[in-house]
Amino acid sequence: LEILVYINGKFYPRQDASISVFDSGYLLGDGVWEGIRFHKGKFLFLGPHLERLFWGASQIDMDIGKTMDEITEILYETVTQNKMETGVHVRLIVSRGIKSTPYQDPSFTISEPTIVVIPEYKQPSPDTQKNGIKLVSVDIIRGSSKVQDHRINSLSKFNCIQACIDAHRKGGDEGLMLDPHGYVSTCNSTHFFMVKDNSVLTSTGDFCLHGVTRQNIIDICKTNSIPIYEKNFTLSDVYECEEAFVTGTFGGVVPVNEIDGHELKVLGENSIAVLLQSCYNDLVESESSN
């Protein structure tokens, strides 16, 4: 099945989809992106995704050159061109554009932003959803926003890639990252939650991406009277938790079966993670039917 990729108003077969070597996204990681799920004919939680995209662009003084409505039209045109209906994960990428020379100064940009939409059929693994993933704490931290603001969904993922490599070297599926003060922040590609004393805890959010699924889970907890706290906690606290799970656009709610050698129960009796998985799946179906 041939997948067509959108690049600046045109569609190209996947094998022919390419950008200039002078593109600022390729040269410098200069741009922003979103991963968005397309389910039963609708892009899920599109408003928060586009708000984050445009906010991130504003933080790096980048004019996307399109309105949110125009980006929405591009997204739907892409899945229409591909005759896609459901089970799709889309990567929306906006770079600053073409550079006159390989140099970081934005004033050396000589084109409009490069807008790319990559649609792919993707479904989370049922085995992973049921049995969970293994986390390991990594040496790479989420640093100060004065170094790089991790609330921005930047094309430059070097920090996360380093953490991913470290996690894999240690035998983990994901790396659990600390913030500059030694508190647990997030994972390299997902957000971390733990359950302790029948309460759900996640980080303050000061040193991680403002996750759309993360916020949905926080809202679900509040709606269902599940105590939820955004606060600082340490690895020692994590080792004493009863359950843990990670969240993301692609996987939704995924249980954690082990953290640094500490085994955890996965989706057991009276599991809060089970409840949240169910509530999140209900939210997805509700969102797609509206």
Each predicted region: which residue ranges?
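Glycine- and Gly-Pro-enriched alpha-helical subdomains that act as flexible
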Residues: L176, Y183-G205, H210
